[in-house]
Amino acid sequence: KGGFRVPLYPVTPLVAIALNLFLAVYQYNFDARSWYITAGWIMAGLVIYFLYFEKGVEAEMPQVIGISQPKPAVEYPHRILIPLHNPENVVPLMQLASPLAGKFGGEIIVLGVIDVPQNLPIREGLRFKQYKMPLLKRAVQFGRDNSVPTRTALRVAHRVYDGILAAAAEEEASLILMGWKGYTTKRDRIFGEVTDRVVRHAPCDLITIKLADECSFERILIPTAGGPHADLAAEYAAVFQKALGSKITCCYVVKKDHTRRDVETAHEWMEKTIRESGLDESVERLILEADNVAAAIVQAGSGYDLTLMGASNEGIFSNVLFGEIPEKVARYSWQPVMIVKRYEGAVKSFVKKVLG
């Protein structure tokens, strides 16, 4: 129950909103400069807050607490952060991360986040760190068995995604690799609250993968369409091809009423992808004829162990996480789907943070 009540709710706030709108319109007609000054003042306040005062607030009322772990003996240039929660995902996520760490001369950081209810002090979570360690130690053992540098990280947070994002920033992660259980039924979320937030605000490259009960990466389908995200996905596919012996198939979707030029363009895109990503010539080429691109990829992907694709390019103000086609493929495919998203830069990330 709230600590106070607003008289005549909701009439009072509605009247206040109406009066403020009237005042704003009247002020604009009286002197438009006041609008510009106000807008500039608000933007300056936001910039100053995020650059300076936010750190002071965080110090007084931390949203995330880091639990000290042994420092690495060697500083690696590439760090892969794997948030772990589901014990069934440990092996497949480590199988994917290990060759990437080996390729880029990096290490794997397995992260456990202890979530504390909002009505409890965040430091209460420190008492439960022993319950997270067995899961993390299992991943560390996998890394040790495969000669991949692996260490643990622990965070306590009121919200799991805050713990993941804070760890990624503090550890200067190059890549976040995380699994997800499937789509949520809530309309304002796509992959679930945690995954949605991490995808939107990740400070580095990101891979999210929908895993199945039994995971194998012997046959991988790569839809090619160009763009920075798809190019990065193809580079990762080349790593899996060499390290895991995966058989790769590049595909391109053309319309049913395609022209000869459309087919030539498809071959050009596939050859460009293979050449620039480092895939070898054993890659199969596949042209799909369909008017619905996502449905064609889902149908083709049913014969593969994994569909690996890059996110679509979206505008800076877009609410779409990966793009319409990748999200539909992830939603409707029964097979594992991996979506790769390259870091979009500080400016775009800042705008998305301000807009929420």
PLM regions and their residue ranges:
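C-terminal membrane-solvent junction of multi-pass transporters and transport-like membrane proteins
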Residues: K1-D31
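Gly/Ser-rich helix-loop-strand patches that form or flank binding pockets
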Residues: A44-Y49, F53, A167-E214, G301-G356
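Small/aliphatic-rich secondary-structure junction motif
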Residues: P70-Y131, L135, F142, T150-A153, ...
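Charged docking surfaces used in two-component/phosphorelay signaling
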Residues: V113, R155-D162, L288-A294
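Cytosol-/stroma-facing membrane-proximal "stalk/adaptor" domains immediately downstream
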Residues: E124-I207, E218-R219
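A short, acidic, amphipathic alpha-helical segment used as a generic capping/interface helix at domain edges
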Residues: M270-K272, E289-G301
